[in-house]
Amino acid sequence: MRLDAPIKELVFADGQRMPLEHDSIVVFVGPNNAGKTTCLRDIYSILSNEPHVGLVKEVDFFKPSYDEMKTLLDKISVKTQKPTPHYDGLGFTIHEFELENYSKGPYYPKAIKEMMFSFLSTDARLSACNPEKNISRSGPATGPIALLVKDSSYLEKVSESFSDAFSQEVTPNYFAGGEIPLCLGPTPVVSDEMSASEVSDYIYGILSKYPLAHLQGDGVRSFLGILLYLYIEHYSAMFIDEPESFLHPPQANLMGRIIGSSDTSGRQLFISTHSKELLNGVLSSAAGRVRVVRVTRQGDDNAFALLDGDDVRELSSTTLLKYSDLVNALFHERTVLCESDSDCMFYQAIWDTERSGEASPLFLPVGGKSRFKNFAIILSKLGIDYAVVPDADILRNPGDFKELLSIGGSSWESVKDDWKNVKNDLERGENRLSAVALKTEIDEILDSCKGGQISEKDCGRIRGLIDVKSGWDELKRHGKTALKGEPLSAYGRIEKTFAGCGVYMVPVGELECFVLEVTHHGPSWAAEVFQCYPDLNDDVYSKARKFVSSWWPSDEASDCCSQK
């Protein structure tokens, strides 16, 4: 039995509001020590009107009637008269006076809150695997292991999910005497011909040889501890602090998928995490339920960026975004968007050398100029400080940068005239051969070949005819030095406007022009450069170091980008 007691809305310290559905999964993310766990504690404390920090300052929630609450209490607890009348249940003790106070105000008495809402800290889930006192099978369970003994469907869910992660089933040893330890292994199968005493001895003999859950490592105990509480039916909502703790990435991803599975439908979950694997797992199984809150801190001030359901669905359903590493940006203070993996490798190495005293940003390849805006939109909504690093020929197609300007607080109109100036200059000298003239030129080269064999020189001549270089190609190959006079001044003004929006065009044109001594191009270029010039302080990298130093050059520029 579970009461319908949803949290309807959260109000954060900065006044932002997040409305919730009855089965929402709210995931708090952000850098270390930003306030993720504090947000969980604030929500949990407000439910019972207890002191709280105030990162979440208001919680609007629906409180079930007294009769509904009392029906649940009678079903899942044991009433005891001594020393005073009270109810004992799974993780709670409720006294008569707390029942009397239930209807006197909008908040929950603390003990009743603990019955209906579970706050699963690291210590709580590690200790959940400890042996429990054996109880009467006819009474309610007062702990998760006792519940495993009483509820076969609950045991099946816990055991199957644990087996998916660790290839071992879970079995409570209720033949051990005064305590019920949790064993790792399959439930013994007995013969119909055995007597009751033989069955007891047989099962005890097998279970006593199994590994004990409470003696395992923290990863096993943490994973199992979460499962033990997650599948308890009566909780209206759960709060789980960093469920990925002690888990390897594949297990963290599986835990995320379990958290978002259909077994948790109809219940709200509030999670704090710094694991992209766990978040990806939740998104893969329950994207429609997820709300993301990115918490950051500067000094004593916290900031909150809210990602609503539509944004989350775009993040999880758009193939480009889903299979990128964009989710990882949630856990970094800054992100650098590059065109390719090779760009990311090169710029990260230069950053780590030139700006070693600063936290390294996430370097994220987007797969081409036209895709920068897709990533920038999400990063902006999440309040993530970012830099876009395109080749200079991003100017060729305004559609590739118009939205970047808009997100950054500027506009196409602010650069339109200068762009036309640059465009006209670059395209003024383009002369292309007609098809007839091109065929004539190639025929002449082929006719001159001796012995019917085409030499490398002749191939080069043909390629030269076909590969007519435009002014845009020259801009990409030489950067701003391809321009002179007023077009160069216009380019400089565009460059300044772009930088104010967090867009830093490669000053030498494209990545490969930073080290002209290496003629490779494409994915292998960066690896070849590092092999030829392993000392990143070498003068050959001076232009690249200067360029990387220009990103976020001051607090003013950083503030501009952070407001995108």
Indicate residue ranges for each PLM-predicted region.
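Short, basic, glycine/proline-bearing loop/turn elements
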Residues: 140-145, 208-213, 243-245, 310-311, ...
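Switch/communication elements of ASCE P-loop NTPase nucleotide-binding domains
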Residues: 1-52, 193-328, 345, 515, ...
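Positions that flank functional sites
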Residues: 177-178, 245, 394-395
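Acidic, Mg2+-coordinating catalytic modules of nucleic-acid enzymes
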Residues: 1-19, 24, 49-51, 67-73, ...
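Short amphipathic alpha-helical segments and helix-helix/interface helices
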Residues: 159, 256-260, 279, 283, ...
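Extended helical coiled-coil dimerization/tether regions that scaffold
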Residues: 120-223, 228-237
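Conserved P-loop NTP-binding catalytic core
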Residues: 42-137
